[in-house]
């Protein structure tokens, strides 16, 4: 709760709402050190949400910065975290998330910036940014970029698995 501004009751309410959005209802009294790695990761996500509970405040868009928010999470919690971030963006806020999983990034991001060696190597809408050429250039591996048939979202598979 440290770093939050407002009355104690307001701060506790913001913290409870953030924990609920992170799927941690009832965790308020649990010691952080006793949580699993995935639970600790979701606590970190809740901390970010508690800092900016509303995507727009006083007519100005707020920003939510997330560094690997899906690390250590099972797929169900990965999706829940990224859907919550997408809801924040849909409400008028800005979400800047660092992800290493291009498949998740393609599913949840409107725009992608792909970096390699600290430099931007590709950027733009995910449909245009994720390509065989980008995968080869950034990761030095052959990949097969396909499209999920129902939604035309790109996905990446190693070549050896796609034969």
Report each predicted region and the residues it spans.
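Helical segment within the ABC ATPase nucleotide-binding domain
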Residues: 54-55, 78-91
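Conserved ABC ATPase "signature" region
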Residues: 12-27
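Single conserved hydrophobic/aromatic residue that forms the stacking wall/gate
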Residues: 1-6
């Amino acid at each position: 709760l440290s770093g939050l501004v407002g009355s104690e009751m307001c701060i506790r309410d913001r913290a409870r709402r953030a924990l609920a959005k992170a799927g941690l209802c009832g965790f308020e009294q649990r010691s952080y050190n006793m949580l699993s790695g995935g639970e600790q990761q979701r606590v970190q996500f809740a901390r970010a949400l508690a800092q900016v509970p509303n995507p727009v405040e006083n007519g100005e868009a707020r920003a939510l910065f997330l560094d690997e928010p899906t690390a250590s999470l099972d797929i169900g919690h990965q999706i829940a975290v990224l859907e919550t971030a997408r809801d924040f963006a849909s409400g008028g806020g800005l979400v800047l998330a660092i992800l290493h999983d291009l498949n998740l990034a393609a599913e949840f991001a409107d725009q992608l910036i792909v970096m390699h060696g600290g430099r931007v190597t590709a950027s733009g809408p995910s449909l245009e940014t994720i390509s065989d050429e980008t995968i080869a250039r950034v990761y030095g591996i052959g990949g097969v970029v396909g499209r999920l048939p129902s939604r035309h979202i790109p996905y990446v598979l190693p070549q050896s698995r796609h034969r």
